[in-house]
C-alpha cells in the first residue's frame, strides 16, 4: 500500500542528529503536526460559535481532533472489512494526521475572512483555505530549509512525507495568478507550491498516468474529507442543541422557506434534486427515538370526555397541540441533558462510520475512494446543510463574521501600505523588505494575516483604529 516514494521528503537527509529508525515515517509527521505553532493556533479560531461565549463550544482545534479520530476510525473499519481489496492496509495514523491539519490554513473569522483575503489577493494568486494549508505545511512552518531555494523560496516547512502532503490535497487545481471579480472563488493550490505538488503526485502515482477526467485524490484524503463532513454534520449540530439555538422540535417544525434552502444546498452533493419531503423524512427518522411516542394503549388527555360532533374538530386540534407540546418538552432534553446529546452524536457517528463503503482503484490503489450509500449520504447532507442554513447563516452568528470581513480587509490594506512593514514582527518584516515584487509582498502579508487567531486579529485592528487598544508593550 505504501512505497519508499510515498515516504520520501523534500529535504533529504534531515540533519537533526537523531537516529530515528525505530520511528515510522508517518508517525514522525504526526508528531511534527502536533508540535507545530499553526496547529496550536486553531484553538483561537471559531468553528460555529465563538469560544468566548462558552467553554463547551468547539473551536477549529477541537473540531480537527474530532475529524482526526473519525478519520482513524474509518481507516480501521476499511482495513477490517476490505483487507484484500487494496493490496495492503491503510495507515490509520496517516489519516488522523490529515484530519489534524485539514483546517490549519483557515484565516480568522471563518469563510468571511477567507473571502476578504481572496478579494485582496485576486491580482496576486488568490487565497483559499486548503491552498493555505498546503503552504503552511510545505513553506511557512519553521522546521527546515532547502539547501538551495526551490521556486525562489528556501523554506521547506515541516518537510513532511509526500504521502502525508498528498492526504491534504483535496483539490487538484492550480489557482490562477490573476482573476477578475466575476471569475468567482477558486479552490486548489497556489502557483508558488505547484512544483511541490508535482513532486508529491509523481511520488504517489509511482508511474501511473491520470486519465483525462481523473483528479488526483488519495484514499487518505478521501477519508479525511468524509470525516470532516461527518464531524461537521453531527458535532456542529450538537453545539446548536447545547446552546438552545436549535432543537429537534424546531427542526421538525421548520417552515418551507428554510427547508427549500436546505434542499437546494443538499442537491448539489447528492447530484440530484432533493425534496422538502425527503428532508422532513430524514428528521422524522433521526428524531423518532428521541421524542417519546405514546404507546398505542396509552391514555389520551381527552379520554373520558364526550365529544359532540360540532366540537370534534376542535378536540382533535387540542389533542394535536398536546402531542406537540409533549414532543417539544422531550426535545428540550437535548439542550439540558448531556447524556442524551452524547448518545445522539455517538449513534450518528457510529452509523456513518459503519456505513462507509470502498471503491477500489485497481490500477493505482492509492487513488481508491470511500463513500456513503445513498441513504446515509442524504442523512449527512441534510444535517450538514440544515445546520449551515439555520445556524451558521443566522444573523446572530453572521454578525460577528461580517464584522470580521471588514477587520481582515482593513488589516491587509494597512500592512500593504508604504510603511506597513513596520507594523509586523521582525522576521516577517525582513521578508517583506526583500520581496522582489508586489505579488510576493502581498503573499507575505496574506500569510501573516491568515495566521492570526480571531482574538489577535481584533487586537491588531484595535491598535490600528481604536482609542481603547491593547497596551503598546504587548508583543506583536
Curated annotation (Swiss-Prot):
PROSITE patterns listed in its UniProt record: HD
All residue ranges annotated as the HD domain in the record: 60-233
Region (Disordered): 1-20
Keyword field contains Hydrolase: yes
UniProt KW keywords: Hydrolase
Gene Ontology molecular-function annotations: dGTPase activity
PANTHER family assigned: DEOXYGUANOSINETRIPHOSPHATE TRIPHOSPHOHYDROLASE, DEOXYNUCLEOSIDE TRIPHOSPHATE TRIPHOSPHOHYDROLASE
NCBIfam families membership: dGTP_triPase
Family statement drawn from the similarity comment of this UniProt entry: Belongs to the dGTPase family. Type 2 subfamily.
Protein name per the record: Deoxyguanosinetriphosphate triphosphohydrolase-like protein 2
Amino acid at each position: 500500500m505504501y512505497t519508499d516514494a510515498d515516504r520520501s521528503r523534500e529535504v533529504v537527509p534531515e540533519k537533526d542528529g537523531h537516529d530515528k529508525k525505530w520511528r515510522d515515517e508517518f508517525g514522525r509527521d504526526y508528531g511534527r503536526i502536533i508540535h507545530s505553532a499553526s496547529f496550536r493556533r486553531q484553538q483561537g479560531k471559531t468553528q460555529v460559535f465563538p469560544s468566548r461565549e462558552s467553554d463547551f463550544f468547539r473551536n477549529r482545534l477541537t473540531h480537527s481532533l474530532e475529524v482526526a479520530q473519525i478519520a482513524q476510525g474509518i481507516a480501521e473499519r476499511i482495513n477490517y472489512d476490505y483487507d484484500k481489496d487494496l493490496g495492503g492496509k491503510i495507515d490509520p495514523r496517516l489519516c488522523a494526521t490529515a484530519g489534524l491539519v485539514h483546517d490549519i490554513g483557515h484565516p480568522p473569522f471563518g469563510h468571511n475572512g477567507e473571502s476578504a483575503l481572496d478579494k485582496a489577493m485576486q491580482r496576486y494568486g488568490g487565497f483559499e483555505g486548503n491552498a493555505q494549508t498546503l503552504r503552511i505545511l510545505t513553506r511557512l512552518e519553521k522546521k527546515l530549509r532547502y539547501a538551495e531555494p526551490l521556486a525562489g523560496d528556501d523554506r521547506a516547512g515541516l518537510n513532511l512525507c509526500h504521502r502525508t502532503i498528498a492526504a491534504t490535497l483535496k483539490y487538484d487545481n492550480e489557482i490562477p495568478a490573476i482573476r477578475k471579480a466575476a471569475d468567482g472563488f477558486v479552490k486548489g493550490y497556489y502557483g508558488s507550491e505547484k512544483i511541490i505538488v508535482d513532486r508529491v503526485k509523481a511520488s504517489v502515482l509511482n508511474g501511473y498516468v491520470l486519465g483525462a477526467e481523473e483528479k488526483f485524490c488519495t484514499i487518505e484524503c478521501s477519508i479525511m474529507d468524509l470525516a470532516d463532513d461527518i464531524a461537521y454534520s453531527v458535532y456542529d449540530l450538537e453545539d446548536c442543541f447545547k446552546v438552545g439555538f436549535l432543537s429537534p422540535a424546531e427542526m421538525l417544525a421548520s417552515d418551507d422557506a428554510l427547508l427549500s434552502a436546505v434542499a437546494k444546498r443538499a442537491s448539489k452533493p447528492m447530484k440530484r434534486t432533493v425534496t422538502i419531503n425527503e428532508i422532513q423524512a430524514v428528521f422524522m427518522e433521526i428524531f423518532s427515538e428521541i421524542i417519546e411516542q405514546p404507546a398505542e394503549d396509552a391514555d389520551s388527555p381527552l379520554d373520558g370526555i364526550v365529544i359532540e360532533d360540532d366540537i370534534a374538530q376542535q378536540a382533535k386540534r387540542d389533542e394535536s397541540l398536546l402531542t406537540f407540546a409533549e414532543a417539544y418538552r422531550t426535545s428540550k432534553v437535548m439542550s439540558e441533558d448531556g447524556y442524551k446529546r452524547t448518545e445522539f452524536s455517538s449513534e450518528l457517528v457510529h452509523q456513518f462510520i459503519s456505513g462507509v463503503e470502498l471503491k477500489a482503484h485497481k490500477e493505482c490503489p492509492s487513488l481508491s475512494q470511500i463513500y456513503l450509500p445513498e441513504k446515509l449520504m442524504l442523512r449527512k447532507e441534510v444535517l450538514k446543510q440544515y445546520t449551515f442554513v439555520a445556524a451558521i447563516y443566522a444573523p446572530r452568528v453572521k454578525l460577528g463574521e461580517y464584522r470580521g470581513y471588514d477587520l481582515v480587509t482593513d488589516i491587509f490594506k494597512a500592512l500593504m501600505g508604504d510603511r506597513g512593514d513596520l507594523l509586523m514582527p521582525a522576521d516577517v518584516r525582513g521578508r517583506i523588505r526583500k520581496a522582489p515584487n508586489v505579488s510576493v509582498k502581498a503573499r507575505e502579508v496574506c500569510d501573516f494575516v491568515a495566521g492570526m487567531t480571531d482574538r489577535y486579529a481584533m487586537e491588531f485592528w484595535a491598535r490600528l483604529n481604536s482609542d481603547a487598544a491593547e497596551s503598546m508593550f504587548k508583543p506583536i
